[in-house]
Regions:
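Helix-loop-helix hairpin linking two adjacent transmembrane segments in secondary transporters
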Residues: 147-197
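Cytoplasmic helix-loop-helix junction between adjacent transmembrane helices
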Residues: 113-150
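Helix-breaking motifs and short loop linkers at transmembrane-helix boundaries and internal kinks
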Residues: 50, 82, 103-108, 137, ...
């Protein structure tokens, strides 16, 4: 297969636009902070609506399914006809879903609200990931890390806000967070204006800078994508056990309060944010394959220890697991973008969507497993998932193959 190598040529004369990266990261923080309110209030929803674990998992499945199924389609369409202003529209879906959730009186309403929130994420992630790459100035791993760390920071804030605002004041207090959604829409409208101007400038330079560059054979690319998807499955299925059921695990095994469990979840998600910061720049420096290999397989000893640890060591191990495991995702996304030049939106949508979908299916299946057995058994089973990291041995070394400069046509 061949691809147009242009970005490597034009990036050499461009600087990293940290102002845009910061704006996208802040909006990612706000988006994921708002969406993470949903799993953070599961204890409240479970008690208020008399739900079992399977129904809790169904809420997550509804949210993650709408996000995962739509994201690759949104990303592919964005590659063909970029619509930077769709970022603000996507945030509008999230806003509507939150307002619906704050007024929910039935389980069906909760599911519909979760679907709207998921749709907002499906629009936000592919296009914003494209914009982050546009502003990278060639430092793609760094840009992806800065973009993703905003999301991880938002995910860590969600449980904290739920613990200190929503849980004491009730479900209706979620409506207060509409202010954050409106702020994000304003910022994203300005980011969309910049992206439109940037794309026009790059299109003008494309005609003089384009040249052809051979990449990996189609079969090799397909195998590599399949391996990356398997690694994402391992990573996000395991993360689903923590993001959806970690609070229940702590309350069941160690008899801590809901607020204490939420704080533990906040610490874990903070560790995930730290790992995300590290993964991209390290991948730029030493190669993304090595980051992927270590971050998935290297976490295995710690996940195996977690089910047998006391409360103190559970907190420590969760931090170590969060840092190591999270470092993989920026490297995986950029690695995939380099495998298939010209399809930044599609790859971003595919990987983000698959991640959300895996988390949703994982949450539902683990909820069923917890109902059939107990929550402790769930973590015992999940502790072996990082062994899938052995598949990273089948990934080609793009840097050694000279493929790391193969990039997409102007975005």
């Amino acid at each position: 297969m061949t691809a147009t190598r242009t970005e490597a040529l034009t990036d050499a004369g461009q600087k990293t636009v940290f102002k845009i990266l910061a704006a996208i990261s802040v909006c990612h923080l706000l988006n994921d902070m708002l969406t993470s309110l949903l799993p953070s209030i599961y204890p409240l929803l479970k008690s208020s609506f008399h739900l079992d674990f399977a129904e809790v998992g169904l809420i997550t499945l509804t949210y993650q399914s709408t996000a995962s199924l739509l994201q690759p389609l949104v990303g592919l369409q964005a590659d063909r006809r970029p619509r930077p202003y769709s970022l603000a529209v996507g945030m509008g879906f999230t806003l509507f879903g939150l307002l619906m959730l704050s007024m929910a009186r039935t389980f069906a309403t909760i599911l519909v609200a979760a679907a709207f929130v998921g749709t907002g994420s499906s629009v936000f992630h592919p296009e914003s990931s494209r914009v982050a790459r546009m502003a990278s100035g060639g430092q793609h791993g760094l840009a992806q890390s800065l973009f993703q760390v905003g999301g991880n920071a938002g995910l860590s804030l969600g449980p904290l806000l739920a613990a200190f605002i929503v849980l004491p004041r009730g479900l209706s207090s979620i409506a207060w967070f509409s202010v954050a959604a409106l702020l994000a829409m304003i910022i994203l409208a300005n980011v969309g204006s910049w992206a439109k101007r940037h794309r026009l400038n790059r299109t003008k330079s494309h005609a003089t800078n384009a040249e052809q560059h051979a990449t990996l054979p189609v079969k090799k690319v397909a195998l590599s994508i399949a391996v990356l998807m398997a690694l994402l499955f391992s990573k996000f299925f395991y993360l689903a056990s923590l993001t959806s059921y970690y609070t229940f695990y702590l309350m069941s095994k160690f008899h801590v309060s809901v607020r204490s469990a939420q704080i533990h979840l906040f610490v874990f998600l903070g560790a995930v944010a730290l790992g995300t910061i590290v993964g991209g720049p390290v991948g730029d420096r030493i190669g993304r394959k090595y980051v992927i290999w270590y971050s998935i397989l290297g976490v295995l000893p710690f996940t195996l220890l977690l089910p047998y640890a006391n409360l103190f060591w559970t907190g420590i191990l969760s931090v170590v697991i969060g840092v190591i495991l999270a470092s993989a995702f920026p490297a995986i996304v950029v690695y995939g973008q380099e495998l298939i030049p010209g399809r930044v939106g599609m790859i971003s949508g595919l990987f983000f969507g698959f991640a959300f979908g895996t988390a949703g299916v994982g949450a539902a299946l683990l909820g069923e497993l917890a109902d059939l057995t107990d929550i402790n058994f769930v973590y015992l089973v999940c502790s072996f998932l990082p062994a899938v990291g052995l598949l990273a041995a089948f990934l080609p070394n793009l840097e050694r193959a000279g493929l790391h400069t193969a990039q997409e046509s102007p975005v």
